[in-house]
A protein has these predicted regions:
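A short, polar/proline- and glycine-enriched secondary-structure boundary/capping micro-motif
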Residues: 34, 111-115, 158, 183-192
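Active-site neighborhood of phospho(di)ester-bond hydrolases with catalytic His/Asp-centered motifs
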Residues: 24-27, 47-53, 69-75, 101-104, ...
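Short, small-residue-enriched loops and turns at beta-alpha junctions
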Residues: 29-30, 78-79, 109, 155, ...
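N-terminal active-site segment of His-dependent metallophosphoesterases
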Residues: 1-69, 77-97, 159-161, 193-194
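Conserved beta-sheet core of the metallophosphoesterase superfamily
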Residues: 70, 108-172, 176
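Pre-active-site segment of Zn-dependent metallo-hydrolases
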Residues: 28-42, 102-122
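Charged phosphate-binding loop/patch that engages nucleotide di/tri-phosphates or the phosphate backbone
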Residues: 169-194
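Short, flexible active-site-adjacent loop segments at beta-strand->alpha-helix junctions, enriched
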Residues: 75, 94, 106, 152, ...
């Protein structure tokens, strides 16, 4: 599978103070968790990114009740007007502040797929937002930040049901996960090896 090139671009303006918040979701599979709408509303996002495996496109209409939605198709999604990948450009006074490549399948484990890294580099993105694995993840590879929000769809294996947030303040972006069931910050469990 090779990712398409020349993704559509969406330009968004930072708020007057230079702040912006994205809620980030993925892998809804037509059945977002019952608490997901409340959790998203609590975040008060400026926009919502959906990193694919939407399922029924009515899911996007429900998300749009909270904030404008920008989505990409996932591997379970059929043909539609939803693109395979998308560039999100945050600007302030016509100056680019952050460029995000939104794509469904981007990583193998903690490493970016070569085709995704090529597109992100060509498009000068600094952050790749993806879905597919249902595994919440924040990492870096090939000088790019990588963010998988996890899934707010049906539970898969023993994975948590989580969503993500990208908070832009004072020129920097903070990536975080929120437990959809409790509304509390989510961090990976600690493992102690003896």
């Amino acid at each position: 599978m090779t990712v398409a090139t020349n993704p559509p671009r969406t330009k968004l303006a930072l708020r007057a103070g230079g702040d912006f918040r994205f809620a980030v979701v993925a892998d809804t599979h037509s059945k977002p968790h019952p608490a997901s709408a409340q959790r998203l509303a609590e975040l008060e996002p400026d926009a919502i990114l959906h990193a694919g495996d939407i399922g029924d496109l009515a899911v996007l209409d429900e998300l749009a009740k909270v904030a404008p939605v920008f989505a990409v198709r996932g591997n379970i999604d059929g043909p539609s007007d939803v693109p395979e990948l998308r560039l999100i450009e945050l600007t302030s006074a016509d100056t680019l502040k952050l460029r995000i490549l939104l794509v469904h399948i981007a990583v193998y484990g903690p490493k970016l797929r070569a085709d995704v890294a090529r597109v992100a580099t060509k498009e000068r993105a600094s952050l790749v937002v993806c879905g597919h694995s249902h595994v919440p993840f924040i990492g870096r590879d090939r000088a790019l930040s990588v963010f998988n929000p996890g899934s707010i769809g049906p539970r898969r294996f023993q994975l948590p049901i989580v969503l993500g947030a990208i908070d832009i303040r004072a020129g920097s972006a903070r990536l975080r996960h929120i437990d959809c069931e409790t509304g509390k910050p989510w961090t990976p469990p600690s493992v102690h090896v003896t």
